[in-house]
Amino acid sequence: MTTTMSETIHVGPVGVTFVLEAEQTGGTLTAFECEVPTAAKVPAPHSHDAFEETIYGLEGTITFTVEGVDHEVGPGQAAFIPRGAVHGFVNRGDEDARFLAVITPGLFGPAYFREVGVVLAAGGPPDLEAIMGVMRRHGLTPA
């Protein structure tokens, strides 16, 4: 089975493009590319109890903090985030970073990013309560 990537969803300056959605994998996994500009504001630390996340670096270097420990992920490197682990990420480098995220099982998809993107596009300071509500609806627990 081959697929083409869907449209890029913008969540602030971060771009998310799904490679595989749950409907294409029988719910086994979802996979998306994430483009993170230097010093971009990224998601608050969070956890998810229903799925794991595997990260594979494509370009630049992204720092994932998992349970308080930093993991630098560059091209060809990977990191695994188990269920329940508090984590977040930041691009501390001087170039944009891009990584592939694989979610298993495929319980997390584009709807989350679209909803957060709408909240952020409203203008003004981000509505943190609204963002946390979106996170909870999609199985993420803010830390």
Region annotations inferred by a language model:
Residues 15, 54, 61-63, 70, ...:
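Structural motif
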Residues 63, 83-110:
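Ligand-binding loop in jelly-roll beta-barrel domains
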Residues 9-45, 51-52:
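A short glycine-rich, His/Asp/Glu-containing loop-to-beta-strand
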